[in-house]
């Protein structure tokens, strides 16, 4: 790669993306790419019967008709743009999509777009894997430098860093040269948007999942503009009014230091549970507690949950009086109360947030900042749970890493169990088995139809 000092940030990222080749990817990055691809598809299949997903499919069919790319879980084909948008929203809906400790949720903004465009253009599995890996690297160059400021300002990364990374993914799939990839990235900067107000208004809006769709659509649009010859600002990232300044606290060349040396996709994590990733360590710590002994829930005096700052703030993460399933999926008091009662945290468990047995425990929960766990963040994302009974018995559970993190990765059997749970009933059993096997073979396919045909309902 050319010396970073001779390039601005846009050029440097575009140069890396345009020159990345499949053979440059380490085996772990290829393995994770296969898992990310199948995981994203199965997350979408699991959401197939929900109201929002049906609405998205109807909207995409009306506004983006075509025969280029499959709407997963259906026998409908749409334009590549329509399928990418709808599949992105759908794969995000259950909140079981992948989760990187620093970059956040990445796959929903990149994988549906890459698959739709590769399907449209008859590209191979190796090309798909390489494009997705490049998109993760873009995310990794952009998101960490603004992450803290985003959280303080209530901004959402999916349609911000997600839009920029999607622009590069689209440009690569469209075969654009380095200069046009750079322009796609630069043009997408002014399309980046999105807040987390949807959490406070959960149940009253659909924005959480639409943000992934916005990223896909805007990223693709930016690439189309670049392909047509439009130019974006060279300082779109590191300029005085560029992205790092607008969404963060300014540019630091160290933001780009890992490009070409570290592959972000190899560091991503996966969600074995539903709901927000920041509550998952609480799920695992509670299950760790239950493995050591089941407290009599009718005799619980108090429950204490200790975690890191990002897991306990802002206020919706410690909300006691949730009005909707969407709010409940972010609430630590609800999480620990549900898992103590049910032992799991899937969509059907979160939906039980208002049951009497759960609500009996919620007021007894105290959420605190655990100083040691907070000091370890973001290298670790742990949680500690304590349950004290009226007789003084103490039950404790602790994890240093949520299940699915690189240091506590799901086993192949656990991955397959998740995939089967999500895809069950959406596609034939033989297709589910073949899709599970795609984790290790997706790079070997010659045409994207070999993958997307497995998502058909029959």
Summary of predicted features, one role per range:
Residues 187-196:
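Flexible glycine/proline-rich, aromatic-decorated loop/lid segments
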Residues 138-164, 212:
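Aromatic-lined, polymer-binding surfaces characteristic
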Residues 120-132, 175-182, 231-235:
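Structural helix-adjacent loops and short alpha-helical linkers that scaffold large soluble proteins
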Residues 47, 114-121, 167-173, 222-226, ...:
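Well-ordered alpha-helical scaffold segments within catalytic/enzyme domains
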Residues 1-104, 203-217, 224-458:
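Terminal-appendage/accessory-domain detector
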């Amino acid at each position: 790669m050319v010396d970073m000092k001779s390039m601005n940030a846009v050029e440097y990222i575009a140069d890396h993306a345009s020159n990345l080749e499949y053979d440059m990817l380490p085996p772990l990055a290829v393995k994770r790419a296969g898992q990310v691809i199948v995981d994203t598809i199965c997350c979408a299949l699991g959401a197939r019967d929900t109201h929002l997903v049906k609405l998205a499919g109807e909207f995409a069919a009306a506004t983006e008709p075509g025969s280029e790319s499959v709407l997963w879980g259906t026998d409908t084909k749409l334009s590549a743009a329509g399928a990418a948008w709808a599949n992105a929203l759908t794969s995000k809906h259950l909140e079981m999509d992948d989760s990187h400790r620093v970059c956040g949720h990445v796959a929903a903004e990149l994988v549906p777009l890459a698959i739709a465009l590769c399907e449209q253009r008859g590209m191979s599995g190796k090309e798909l894997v390489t494009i997705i890996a490049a998109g993760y690297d873009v995310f990794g160059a952009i998101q960490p430098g603004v992450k803290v400021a985003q959280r303080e300002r209530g901004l959402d990364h999916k349609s911000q860093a997600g839009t920029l990374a999607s622009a590069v993914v689209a440009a690569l799939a469209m075969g654009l040269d380095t200069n046009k990839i750079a322009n796609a990235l630069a043009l997408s900067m002014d399309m980046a948007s999105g807040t987390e107000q949807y959490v406070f208004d959960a149940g009253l809006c659909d924005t959480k999942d639409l943000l992934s769709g916005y990223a896909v659509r805007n990223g693709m649009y930016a690439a189309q503009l670049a392909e047509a010859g439009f130019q974006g600002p060279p300082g779109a990232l590191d300029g005085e009014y560029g992205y790092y300044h607008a969404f963060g606290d300014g540019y630091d060349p160290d933001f780009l230091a890992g490009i070409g040396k570290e592959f972000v996709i190899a560091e991503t994590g996966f969600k074995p549970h539903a709901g927000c990733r920041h509550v998952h360590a609480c799920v695992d710590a509670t299950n760790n507690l239950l493995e050591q002994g089941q407290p009599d829930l009718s005799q619980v005096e108090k429950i204490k949950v200790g975690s890191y700052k990002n897991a306990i703030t802002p206020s919706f993460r410690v909300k006691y009086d949730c009005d909707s399933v969407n709010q409940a999926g972010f609430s630590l008091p609800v999480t620990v109360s549900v898992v103590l009662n049910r032992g799991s945290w899937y969509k059907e468990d979160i939906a039980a947030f208002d049951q009497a047995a759960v609500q009996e425990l919620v007021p007894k929960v105290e959420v605190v900042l655990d100083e040691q766990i907070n000091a370890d963040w973001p290298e670790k994302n742990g949680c500690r749970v304590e349950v004290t009974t009226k007789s003084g018995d103490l039950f404790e559970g602790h994890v240093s890493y949520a299940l699915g993190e690189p240091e506590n990765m799901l086993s192949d059997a656990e991955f397959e169990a998740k995939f089967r749970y999500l895809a069950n009933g959406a596609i034939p059993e033989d297709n589910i088995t073949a899709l599970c096997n795609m984790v290790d073979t997706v790079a070997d396919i010659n045409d994207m139809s070999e993958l997307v045909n497995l998502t058909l309902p029959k």
